[in-house]
């Protein structure tokens, strides 16, 4: 008994000792650590212990040393024995004035958990075209990382779609939505180092920093030169770059080409396929962009092979039609003869074809009796003659009216014998397959199959294609294959520069050369520069660049990149290199750099007025006012329309040409920008947990940020305790969340303030060549004509005050869109600035926005369901207004072209009557000036301004050697004259003379000297001296289908000219009426001729002799004319 009591006492003492030890240990632990910090990237907690024994840097600072090409980040590790720093304080500890108190280490010496992802637990959070965003966990701490390499991430969660490697071509972000569809080559994660409260620690490659992550659309960047070439088969151009690696691709605006970028080093050759020559594709190479000219490969090949021979070119170009004609001849003669002769021997083939096509044959035969043009006797097809063939539809031997009742297909009797059988019976099958209609159809199918077999064996083109060497491409103009490599950047300094007050001393390493010169640095640069490289930067580039150099390091210097094609300054070049490094410092500067475009890819094909497709109309003056002929012109306000007017008062020898061309018509909208919205790609969460206290206690260590904050209390109770925390109904978890936005899919929301109809109208002819913008608000007026718009906006889909969205595809969308600062559940949330900073969101998260979890033994966790408002998914309810992409001007207005009529364009033209009279004497032309600028042998030509004074009013023809002109006739008035003329010259017209022929009279001609010509040869793909391009353009103009159509309608110009704006419509109506009239008369003539032949009326009748004149031997009357001596002829068959 005593032993049992002794054992009981020992157990109680042991339990008491264990309990006391636990309490003491917990007290000691609580003194050492007050709480835990958990940071979540997405759904994963990241834990920092704020204990004195286990320190983790709560702040970082970067100290930069002076080096030549790149700068190294240094992090300071600061010890904080107290609690965690408040969020509103600086996220980095300021550098102390005493360098001896700092502990400075290299970033490369710090343990980088992002680089050890293969041996740690990691998860892929996002994959872009050029890098990856992921998180790794080490000792309960989760680190957020962005890397340009996929090495070591194969074992991470969500790595199924992770590529083996990312492209290394340099890219920079695009912020302007209208540039995305032209230059977008994918997306990339960038770090924005802005001085805002929403920053958090992030590591890019191996460089730690504080900022926010966003997914941006990117474009290519770099120095690239496109080598000109004669654009002929095999349609190859060459590109070169001095950089170590460069990217290029061929892109059609709006096309998704994020994985089609091709990298090269040094030089590369590009061969264009036929689909790339449609005039819509662009060649993008680094900063350069070039429009691939529209080229009809088939036409160009024929023109090159049969140059200077228009007949051979026509035969080669139209060879596809010749092939069809040949096949048609083969089908209708030998193949048809062969099919007809083998019908019976090949009965098995026709039975098989009939079995395959039986449903079609059955349907055609059953519907035949309802066909309006069938023969009334036997059912054959009858369109013109209304006569039947000898064999009817049921293969009767002769045609007769009784066949209709005998043939089951044409019979309408319900009790026919065949109605007893099913449609699928053998009786019906034999009947259907053996009808005349079915046999004719099966024969036709057989002929087509034989023709297709023969067609496939014929050559596709008469023009031979040139083959390239195996594995190489020929570069036109170069006799060799160029594979030169450029020198790489040096790994260490090669020179030394010492800037003094009065001189500069330069020393070249490895030599004994020392150069001394005067101090010619930039003036008024007041900043401290101690190291040698700082002095050099201050001297040559200024203090602004030195500030970037010190505070914004370049991890990759890109020393070969000059940015010359964009015209970047030294500061702009440095910022562009920072963007290449994946760092965004300022969205305003970024937008400026990404908005720069080098090349002609955005240039529209500004061709001259297409006179070959415009209708021609003779125009009569309406009245005479003050000695001037007044012409009243009215046209439909539709883009691409126009008219060529021929003016003549019946006194002048030649008509005067006056052309009106409406180049484009649309609506100019003035808008007010509201906000930007984008989808949420991931969420960053930062929270802090306490064992005791409430939200106020928690906020002492985790301060409020102002938006998207949350707090959960109580968090400590039975069953929800961390180790050594025995509080009941105590504790709190507080923090905030920040979203990572996919700016690649962002929409910008605008409010429409005003709409105005705008038309670009080009005038050519006797008034010279000029294009003017006319609006509905302000009529256009000059000395010779007036123009105004009669607006009609009832078809416009955008109303004033409506909210519209400008999408990443540059299209305009409308629908239910949330207004600014409106939490309604419509498309438009989150509401952001251009750089992805929220401007309207939830101040405090609610219970439905997150979930909180804990365990009896373990850490607490917070999962964010929705960080703020998110209605981006409602974008599917938006409606695209137009298929035409638009570009905004300073985010305040845009122009949207319309494909329908917006009203009427009314013009009043007053021309002096002297223009239509022969000049009485040679005019006196003084103060002449003719200046031109542009390119030779190109689509744009030379834009010239002709100015002079005249003492007479007259009409004149103009010409100049080796040049074609946009207009060959001018209306000259008395006094000052000014004309815009476009010249297309094969040689430089500088110092040549333009000749004016008043009223076409060479005896009183006047010469004007070309004063100045500025030739600006653009760097693009096609060479400006491409003679084949000129021949192709000439051929297309001469053989245009529109030109042929206008030629057919031209006989009706005079009548149609009296109907004003209905000119072209009347011409078409008259042409159709003329065709019907001719067809009707031809039908009557055919019927008369057929009756004449059928009745043998052409045979001679016996002659009739007159008793009174027996001496007359020649027959005067024919037998068929003696209608009184024979019964009347039956002409019922002609009806």
Swiss-Prot record:
Residues 177-195 are annotated as: Non-covalent dimerization. Belongs to the tospovirus envelope glycoprotein family. Disulfide bonds join 114-145, 122-156, 224-285. GO terms for biological process: fusion of virus membrane with host endosome membrane; symbiont entry into host cell; symbiont-mediated perturbation of host process; virion attachment to host cell. The record marks 484-485 as: Cleavage. A motif (Cell attachment site) lies at residues 41-43. The keyword Transmembrane helix applies. The cell attachment site present in these glycoproteins may help in the adhesion of virus to cells. Residues 1-35 form the signal peptide. This is Envelopment polyprotein. Tospoviruses are transmitted from plant to plant by thrips as the insect vector. The keyword Disulfide bond applies. It holds the Pfam family Bunya_G1. It comes from Tomato spotted wilt virus (strain Brazilian Br-01). Glycans are attached at residues 116, 210, 605, 980. Residues 437-484 are annotated as: Signal for signal peptide peptidase.
